[in-house]
Curated annotation (Swiss-Prot):
A motif (LYPX(n)L motif) lies at residues 128-132. One of its GO terms (cellular component) is host multivesicular body. This is Gag-Pol polyprotein. One of its GO terms (molecular function) is zinc ion binding. Residues 432-464, 484-496 have a biased composition (Basic and acidic residues). Residues 343-391 are annotated as: Interaction with host PIAS4. Residues 112-121, 159-170 have a biased composition (Pro residues). It catalyses: DNA(n) + a 2'-deoxyribonucleoside 5'-triphosphate = DNA(n+1) + diphosphate; Endonucleolytic cleavage to 5'-phosphomonoester. Residues 739-930 form the Reverse transcriptase domain.
Length: 1733
């Protein structure tokens, strides 16, 4: 037996468990495959001597580790865990590694022990000192490090042994080498020594003293080793933070240990291993090795120098020599440098900025925290004088607001040092008022403010009453004087005054009381008017009586009316809205004037129901309640001592409600039970709990909230949107109220978001809404913990039927915001009246912030936790700010409500008294109506759904389904009912609303009207789930027992996925139960569930058939349904389809396992064993392989010795498709016979026996809802299975080497398939499906009309072959011709001429009867073409510069495609002007970057670098980026004429062609996915003949387009495919025979250009107006032509050039010209002038 060679790599693989354990100890994870790859492939390439079989050499491992840990792009971070694990195996080897680890070389013997010389003096900047020499009289200690071969150490001895074996005393030469510096001369300090933190110089200890350091002098004068005690290491590790948390503190600790303990190399490793993690230690060692400096004082990269100064393995330093001690000192210095460099975290000034002074934090303590932040998060030293300015600014800006503001106002701030700022801050801090003083001051200011406001209100009220009394007195005096004048008759009246005219001086602009001409002397006692002097006993005497007033609600706003029985009509003073054309004259004290009535009828409710309109009189001093409205209200006015009271006929105060006329019908509805109003005792007993009495709330137990931002977020500033004056005035009172309450405060912030005024429906009131979408994007997301309303009521037992519902008012405003987070929510506001012009921000949690609901919900849960503990018998449900309290009795509900209100008041929350529902048996909560342990849909919810109109767009349909989906628990079978609606919501689907959709729409609405009541889930009782399945839809009802009845809890329904929908009924029931059980779990909360269904599915779940279910689905169903602690199966029941509840009679029993066993493929007698009496035994095979870079495929049907059928398949055909085609062909050829067919394809065998039927049942869809591959071939195979009389499909192994019949037949079929794929060239056809039956002569059926037409043509009938022959070809009947041409047109939508040209280029093997007539009829009647094609326009054809060969001259343009899809909105179109070849790329933007990207990545690699590019003057083409790229590449970029699309005619025409084709394809396919249809449009454009009869495909590739090649019935006659050389020769001929004539034709057009326009200089033309107005001529002018170009004209009177297409000739009528002769001063000259006719 041979021996196996063991290598380090194989050794680790044999002990892989130990390797993984070692990796886990290093906090890393390794994989075996990558372990082998790195060891054998990666690390040998590092050129450090790593063998492919691995090694445990520590030096080589260290070199590899350095390579792996290299910073920047040369490092290998993915290999770090593997080299760290390998290093751990080498440095701490397990038993199976130790034999492979290289032993350490023995330490050289040291010199004899003598007193060491005094150590060299260190640099003043150094903080590390050599070991101290002890005195000679030191007591010897027992040994610590024994000899490797000696006995065990006696730890109880007194003195330790020396650290190294004693050696001979150093000679002079040794002293010169190791201690070269003289005794009195200190060596140069190392570069690292000057950089260490320690800068204090300690005196050199006396050689006679001894200290308890790890290296200390022994009794023999040598340095002895004292190890660290375990207690010291334990204390250091546990009393200090980790290196990752606070590297500075741990670095200072290690520095002090290095200074005081003088540790050796081994001690340093022990210290690092204890205080640092493995990863931190590796990072420190790597940084220390980087700090090693060479002889020139710069960091070196030489490995030998780095290993000498900072070795990774134990060095052989002799600490009794000066050389060894110097090495140790340098090692400690480098170690400290590594600690400092590794501890430097990346600069994060945001962390520094986040340090702010606390409310009660002293300035000195804050400064220390600020400096510590600078040390931790920046590389700057805060003690550095150069950083003092930055620290000072941070100290000022991040101090408390009051301290920061005062520090900013200090004089000569620049000259202040940090110490001066701290002293000033301390003074300000010490002068702060105490909390008690602050509360007292705020209370005093509040009282003073309230007192001032109260006094002002009283003064205003007194002034208002005085003014009203004075006006009423004037009115009554006027009435009295008028009556007196009427009685006197002959007395002259005073002249009538205007409303702004003075009654004293008759001047306008002031009244008599303000008249400057009126004497102001002391007034005498006024005589009392007899009419007003009332001699009443015990009355008011001469005091004015109180005016009768009543406050009514008009239009939702309270209006206080003055009851005036003398007024005929009621009056409003403010504008109530639009006014009608109806008006009336009103006679007042100052004269008469016409006023208008209100437009809208108003409906008032008092004791009765009345309709009324008001008179709008703005000049009236007070709104008046006249006799018209008082009469309708049956009002009664009582005069009492306290004043007049206006009541109804029953003595109750009048309550008036105003609403629009369109809501008048609601007044005639039947009255409902009156709601129990909130009693006054609840308001008075708990004033702090209500928003109406307690004011704005404040959660006293919640700390201010800090809103964390994302790491990369920056402030966003969005300007305020324009706001109308009406909206600004509407939200102004709200802003003022929030400012007075302190919820809004002025601020200055870099953040700003706009304010949106939202008008409340039905009123003129606005409310401010802030657009915080940009702020939400920049704030960290938190997990939402708001309860799900779907199952929130599951925690409400039906036994609790007394409810209290509270809605917290302004809930979010109860939580405070931290001052650091307040600037995030700033917005702009200007109010000149209040003196505000700047920003305001929120001091409370704002609305519109994405995390507000979660933050408030959690805060309220914490505050109400105590209430829940104290009242365990009550049920308290909380959904954000909506509270539901439930109890079993009215008394418990009242007591619990009182306790809850008291708790809310104490906590600082406020409830809305208007929305409160106190101790009722029927309440509304979260859109549900709760009553007697059941939940109902509210009428408002039903009306919302019923009021929605028929959807017109997918968005409206989604809104309807979302609203109705909220109510799906009340609708049995909602998923099945809404099935016709969901396909219309998909993107890219045509919205075609048909009868099915209308029926589903109405059924959902009808189901809502009959929605039943659902019981609340009782978690103390088990649940029953009745499940049924129908046509792929799962339906069920979740019930609970209520006495002898079953009460529904929820109706569940869901559509099964495409895979489950294709199963047999029994398995579909299993899927339905699984789906509904999962949904029911949201309501049952894990309580026991009994499943009842018409199928016995428990046995199916326990033993599911592997034919139908995958392992993953089987495991899922079993884990969900076989949980016996939660799910149980009941007996089989028959369900009522309407109610889904069990019927009283039993249903038909069946065995699901037996039915599934009988469920076979489409043919029940299909066998997989050979038939003994078969007529044929055939072998099929399909082959697909790569040859010369092209995938070739073929299929064959053979016997053991001969080929029955063989065909080459199109290039790219897969092997699975070829196998299906071969098997299908064999079945077709064996029609009506007994057949044994062998196939070596498991795919074809399984499809025929098992999977084909499964695919058919589920609609040939995958689990993702997409079509399966080879759909058409599978359908053809399933259809062909029924053709043979008897059939057996047998699977045989492929590529057998035996001599059996199966092996020979299989080899024959495989060889035939490969040969036919190599020998024959399949004809490409996109018009006919590969597996469809081609037209043959036997399928031709001629009609009488066909026979007549053929007789006229002179065709002959072949009676033997049974078809007509004309021109030597079989004649295709008219119907066949129509079907073929119609199918061709549906694919291409080419015109009549283009399609005819294609058919004539490559004649068909058949003669198509009436081809031209049929084709013309098809193209003319095509609906898609008629909707898209533009009408013809007679435009003269011009000439265009083209390239001389393909790929040299391109035209480029962007065209927009609507609607956008997947973000793509544009098409970038490239057209080769020579060949007409088109390239089009969907793009998301229309930029120069997109143009250059496609040009360099698509055009250049495939067609070469263009020479000329032609574009319009779009921004993407004239930009500097595009032009610069063109200049660098040497491309001549030609910009076409502006506003002239014809100059880019070729690409513009192609844009139209693409859009038309895409439109036709979307109409034909019903899909809106134009990105998916774009390749078909490009295929059509590339294969359409051009002006010269050649297609772009032919010009470019030299081959006929694949569109015109129809399949020949006899495929065996196809010639062999040409070789590569023949193809190249054909291309060469194309270049000479096609490209050169085309180039010559293009050049000939250029040589003979067409005259672009007939206009010449001097002609008169009209110029078109581009924008015409109403009744304005379309043409302007005429103008005279001054200059011309081939495309434009310069005319007199217009500065710009005018395109020739925008002008037309002006015809002038001949006019008779008259000339006049005049003399001049020169007798030899005369003047001729033309007179106008």
């Amino acid at each position: 037996m041979g021996q196996t060679v063991t290598t380090p790599l194989s050794l680790t693989l044999d002990h892989w468990k130990d390797v993984e354990r070692t990796a886990h100890n290093q906090s890393v994870d390794v994989k075996k495959r990558r372990w082998v790859t790195f060891c054998s492939v990666e690390w040998p390439t590092f050129n450090v001597g790593w063998p492919q079989d691995g090694t445990f050499n520590r030096d080589i491992i260290t070199q590899v580790k350095i390579k792996v840990f290299s910073p920047g792009p040369h490092g290998h971070p993915d290999q770090v865990p593997y080299i760290v694990t390998w290093e751990a195996l080498a440095f701490d080897p397990p038993p199976w590694v130790k034999p492979f680890v290289h032993p350490k070389p023995p330490l050289p013997p040291s010199a004899p022990s003598l007193l060491p010389e005094p150590p060299l003096s260190t640099s003043p900047r150094s903080s590390l000192y050599p070991a101290l020499t002890p005195s000679l009289g030191a007591k010897p200690k027992p040994q610590v490090l024994p000899d490797s071969g000696g006995p065990l150490i006696d730890l109880l001895t007194e003195d330790p042994p020396p650290y190294r074996d004693p050696g001979p005393p150093p000679s002079d030469r040794d002293r010169d080498d190791g201690e070269a510096a003289p005794a009195g001369e200190a060596p140069d300090p190392s570069p690292m020594a000057s950089r260490l933190r320690g800068r204090r110089e300690l005196p050199v200890a006396d050689s006679t003293t001894s200290q308890a350091f790890p290296l200390r002098s022994g009794g023999n004068g040598q340095l002895q080793y004292w190890p660290f005690s375990s207690s010291d290491l334990y204390n250091w590790k546990n009393n200090n933070p980790s290196f990752s948390e606070d590297p500075g503190k741990l670095t200072a600790l290690i520095e002090s240990v290095l200074l005081t303990h003088q540790p050796t190399w081994d001690d340093c490793q022990q210290l690092l291993g204890t205080l640092l993690t493995g990863e931190e230690k590796q990072r420190v060692l790597l940084e220390a090795r980087k700090a090693v400096r060479g002889e020139d004082g710069r960091p070196t990269q030489l490995p030998n120098e780095i290993n000498d100064a900072f070795p990774l393995e134990r060095p052989d330093w002799d600490y009794n020599t000066q050389r060894g001690r110097n090495h140790l000192v340098l090692y400690r210095q480098l170690l400290l440098a590594g600690l400092q460099n590794a501890g430097r975290s990346p600069t994060n000034l945001a962390k520094v900025k986040g340090i702010t002074q606390g409310p009660n934090e002293s300035p000195s303590a804050f400064l220390e925290r600020l400096k510590e932040a600078y040390r931790r998060y920046t590389p700057y030293d805060p003690e550095d004088p150069g950083q003092e300015t930055n620290v000072s600014m941070s100290f000022i800006w991040q101090s408390a607001p009051d301290i920061g503001r005062k520090l900013e106002r200090l004089e000569d701030l620049k000259s202040k040092t940090l110490g001066d700022l701290v002293r000033e801050a301390e003074k300000i801090f010490n002068k702060r008022e105490t909390p008690e003083e602050r509360e007292e001051r705020i209370k005093r200011e509040t009282e003073e403010k309230e007192e001032r406001r109260r006094a002002e209100d009283e003064q205003k009220e007194k002034e208002r009453d005085r003014r009203r009394h004075r006006e009423m007195s004037k009115l009554l005096a006027t009435v009295v004087s008028g009556q007196k004048q009427d009685r006197q008759g002959g007395e002259r009246r005073r002249p009538q005054l205007d409303k702004d005219q003075c009654a004293y001086c008759k001047e306008k602009g002031h009244w008599a009381k303000d008249c400057p001409k009126k004497p102001r002397g002391p007034r005498g006692p006024r005589p009392q008017t007899s009419l007003l002097a009332l001699d009443d006993q015990g009355g008011r005497g001469q005091e004015p009586p109180p005016e009768p007033r009543i406050t009514l609600k008009v239009g939702g706003q309270p209006v206080t009316f003055l009851v005036d029985t003398g007024a005929q009509h009621s009056v409003l003073t403010q504008n109530p809205g639009p006014l009608s054309d109806k008006s009336a004259w009103v006679q007042g004290a100052t004269g008469g004037k016409r006023y208008r009535w209100t437009t809208d009828r108003k409906v008032h409710l008092a004791t009765g129901k009345v309709t009324h309109s008001f008179l709008h009189v703005p000049d009236c001093p007070y709104p008046l309640l006249g006799r018209d409205l008082l009469t309708k209200l049956n009002a009664q006015i009582h005069f009492e001592g306290s004043g007049a009271q206006v009541v109804g006929p029953r003595g109750q105060p009048l309550q008036v409600l105003t609403l629009n006329i369109e809501d008048e019908y609601r007044l005639h509805e039947t009255s409902k039970e009156p709601d129990v109003s909130l009693g006054s005792t609840w308001l008075s007993d708990f004033p702090q709990a209500w928003a109406e009495t307690g004011g704005m709330g404040l959660a006293v137990r919640q700390a201010p909230l800090i809103i964390p931002l994302k790491a990369t977020s920056t402030p966003v500033s969005i300007k305020q949107y324009p706001m109308s004056q009406e909206a600004r005035l509407g939200i102004k009172p709200h802003i003022q109220r929030l400012l007075d309450q302190g919820i809004l405060v002025p601020c200055q912030s870099p953040w700003n978001t706009p304010l949106l005024p939202v008008k409340k429906p039905g009123t003129n009131d606005y409310r401010p809404v802030q657009d915080l979408r940009e702020v939400n994007k920049r704030v960290e997301d938190i997990h939402p913990t708001v309860p799900n309303p779907y199952n929130l009521l599951s925690g409400l037992p039906p036994s609790h039927q007394w409810y209290t519902v509270l809605d917290l008012k302004d809930a979010f405003f109860c939580l405070r915001l931290h001052p650091t987070s307040q600037p995030l929510f700033a917005f702009e506001w200007r109010d000149p009246e209040m003196g505000i012009s700047g920003q305001l921000t929120w001091t409370r949690l704002p609305q519109g912030f994405k995390n507000s609901p979660t933050l408030f919900d959690e805060a309220l849960h914490r505050d109400l936790a105590g209430f829940r503990i104290q009242h365990p018998d009550l049920i308290l449900l909380q959904y954000v700010d909506d509270l539901l309290l439930a109890a079993t009795s009215e008394l418990d509900c009242q007591q619990g409500t009182r306790a809850l209100l008291q708790t809310l008041g104490d906590l600082g929350y406020r409830a809305s008294a208007k929305k409160a529902q106190i101790c009722q048996k029927q309440v509304k909560y979260l859109g549900y109506l709760l009553k007697e342990g059941q939940r109902w849909l509210t009428e408002a919810r039903k009306e919302t759904v019923m009021g929605q109109p028929i959807p017109k767009t997918p968005r409206q349909l989604r809104e309807f389904l979302g609203t109705a989906g909220f109510c799906r628990l009340w609708i049995p079978g909602f998923a099945e009912m809404a099935a016709p609606l969901y396909p219309l919501t998909k993107t890219g689907t045509l919205f075609n609303w048909g009868p099915d959709q209308q029926k589903a729409f109405q059924e959902i609405k009808q189901a809502l009207l009959t929605a039943p009541a659902l019981g609340l889930p009782d978690l103390t009782k088990p649940f029953e789930l009745f499940v049924d399945e129908k046509q792929g839809y799962a339906k069920g009802v979740l019930t609970q027992k209520l006495g002898p009845w079953r009460r529904p809890v929820a109706y569940l329904s869901k559509k099964l996925d495409p895979v489950a929908a294709g199963w047999p009924p029994c398995l579909r029931m299993v899927a339905a139960i699984a789906v509904l059980t999962k949904d029911a779990g949201k309501l049952t909360m894990g309580q026991p569930l009994v499943i009842l269904a018409p199928h016995a599915v428990e046995a199916l779940v326990k033993q599911p058939p592997d034919r139908w279910l995958s392992n993953a689905r089987m495991t899922h169903y079993q884990a969900l349904l076989l949980d016996t602690d939660r799910v149980q199966f009941g007996p089989v029941v028959a369900l009522n389809p309407a109610t889904l509840l069990p019927l009283p009679e039993e249903g038909l029993q069946h065995d699901c396992l037996d039915i599934l066993a009988e469920a076979h493929g489409t043919r029940s007698d299909l066998m997989d064993q050979p038939l003994p009496d078969a007529d044929h035994t055939w072998y099929t095979d399909g082959s697909s392989f790569l040859q010369e870079g092209q995938r070739k495929a073929g299929a064959a049907v053979t016997t053991e010795t001969e080929v029955i059928w063989a065909r080459a398949l199109p290039a790219g055909t897969s092997a699975q498709r070829a196998e299906l085609i071969a098997l299908t062909q064999a079945l077709k050829m064996a029609e009506g016979k007994k057949l044994n067919v062998y196939t070596d394809s498991r795919y074809a065998f399984a499809t025929a026996h098992i999977h084909g039927e499964i695919y058919r049942r589920r609609g040939l869809l995958t689990s993702e809802g997409k079509e399966i591959k080879n759909k058409d071939e599978i359908l053809a195979l399933l259809k062909a299975l029924f053709l043979p009389k008897r059939l057996s499909i047998i699977h045989c192994p492929g590529h057998q080497k035996g001599n059996s019949a199966e092996a020979r037949g299989n080899r024959m079929a495989d060889q035939a398939a490969r040969e036919v794929a190599t020998r024959e060239t399949p004809e490409t056809s996109t018009l006919l499906i590969e597996n469809s039956t081609p037209y043959t002569h036997e399928h031709f059926h001629y009609t009488v009309t066909d026979t007549k037409d053929l007789t006229k043509l002179g065709a002959t009938y072949d009676s033997a072959k049974k078809y007509w022959v004309y021109q030597g070809k079989p004649v295709m009947p008219d119907q066949f011709t129509f079907e073929l041409l119609d199918f061709l047109h549906q694919l291409t939508h080419l015109s009549f001429s283009k399609t005819k040209a294609l058919l004539e280029r490559s004649p068909s093997p058949y003669y198509m009867l009436n081809r031209d007539r049929t084709l013309k009829n098809i193209t003319e009647t095509c609906k898609a073409c008629a909707q898209v094609n533009a009408s013809k326009s007679a435009v003269k054809q011009g000439t265009r510069v083209r390239g001389h060969r393909p790929g040299t001259h391109w035209e480029i343009d962007f065209t927009e495609v609507k609607p956008g899809l997947y973000g793509y909105k544009y098409l970038l179109v490239f057209v080769d002007t020579f060949s007409g070849w088109i390239e089009a790329f969907p793009t998301k933007k229309e930029t120069a970057k997109v143009v250059t990207k496609k040009l360099l990545e698509e055009i250049f690699p495939r067609f070469g670098m263009p020479q000329v590019l032609g574009t319009d003057n779009g921004p993407a083409f004239v930009s500097k980026v595009s032009q610069t790229v063109a200049d660098l590449l040497g491309i001549d970029w030609k910009l076409h004429c502006a506003y002239r699309p014809q100059s880019s005619g070729q690409v513009e025409r192609m844009n139209r062609t693409i859009k038309e084709t895409l439109t036709k394809l979307t109409l034909a396919t019903g899909s809106r996915d134009w990105v998916l249809l774009l390749p078909l449009a490009l295929y059509r454009a590339r294969n359409t003949p051009g002006p010269h009869g050649l297609t772009p495909y032919e010009i470019l590739y030299g081959a006929p387009p694949p569109l015109v090649n129809f399949p020949d019935p006899d495929m065996t006659r196809v010639t062999n495919s040409p070789s590569l050389q023949a193809h190249l020769q054909a291309l060469y001929l194309v270049q000479h025979e096609v490209w050169r004539p085309l180039a010559a034709a293009y050049q000939e057009q250029l040589d003979r250009p067409v005259v672009p326009h007939p206009y010449r200089v001097g002609d008169t033309v009209w110029v078109r107006r581009h924008q015409t107005k109403n009744l304005e001529p379309r043409w302007k002018g005429p103008y005279t032509v001054l200059l011309t170009t081939p495309t434009a004209l310069k005319v007199d009177g217009i500065s710009a050039w005018v395109h020739a297409a925008h002008v037309k000739a002006a015809t002038t009528s001949p006019a008779r010209t008259a000339w006049k002769v005049q003399r001049s001063q020169n007798p030899l000259k005369i003047r001729l002038s033309r007179e106008p006719s």
